[in-house]
Design a protein with these regions (language model features):
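Residue-level detector of functionally pivotal "anchor" positions at catalytic/ligand-binding pockets or at interdomain
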Residues: 149-169
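His-enriched metal-coordination microenvironments in redox/metal-binding proteins
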Residues: 1-147
Length: 169
């Protein structure tokens, strides 16, 4: 869990669940960073929320071999809450995506992040920060939920709104 703190005059904003136990895990072998894998490799990771969240934004991040992204939450009752689905990933789409309104995700929900890659025999993948390397990285920006958060309009223009640019589940 990698937390970054940002503040404004009214509230402190918690951020950045990057689906890794620590920053060091991003540089070592692990279930989602072993990129020299057979054809059809994909990254998948999940986490269970210890508290209710209000989702503010998400940053799915892959490089040139990324082919798709899907992130959703499954509530303890089994309800599927779509967060983002990008069936045809494009390198130029790296960036933050914001819901039109804060999205409430209940405590105990499991967030799943899944990305696929074109790692055919002609596309040998290694993890790294260069464009020609590859990544599976998906920070989620949130604040602890308060009643009524889901009614708060984030005021994001439609050029970066999840609901306007990305196909939901």
């Amino acid at each position: 869990l990698d937390l970054e703190i940002s503040a404004n005059t009214e509230t402190e904003v918690e951020a950045c669940l990057n689906f890794s136990n620590s920053f060091a895990d991003m540089y070592g072998p692990g279930p989602i960073y072993q990129f020299g894998q057979p054809t059809g490799f994909y990254g998948e990771q999940n986490c269970e929320l210890p508290e209710d969240w209000s989702l503010l934004g998400i940053l799915p991040h892959s490089h040139l071999m990324g082919t798709s992204w899907e992130v959703y939450a499954e509530t303890p009752e089994g309800e599927n809450l779509p967060i983002i689905k990008i069936p045809n990933w494009d390198f130029d789409w790296q960036g933050f995506y914001y819901p039109e309104y804060m999205q409430h995700i209940p405590a105990g929900s499991r967030i799943e992040a899944i990305a696929t890659y074109d790692n055919t025999s002609d596309n040998d993948m290694t993890w790294g920060e260069l464009t020609t390397d590859e990544m599976f990285f998906c920070p989620i920006y949130y604040i602890p939920y308060e009643e009524g958060d889901e009614n708060i309009y984030l005021g994001i223009d439609t050029q970066t709104s999840i609901s306007e640019n990305i196909t939901n589940i």
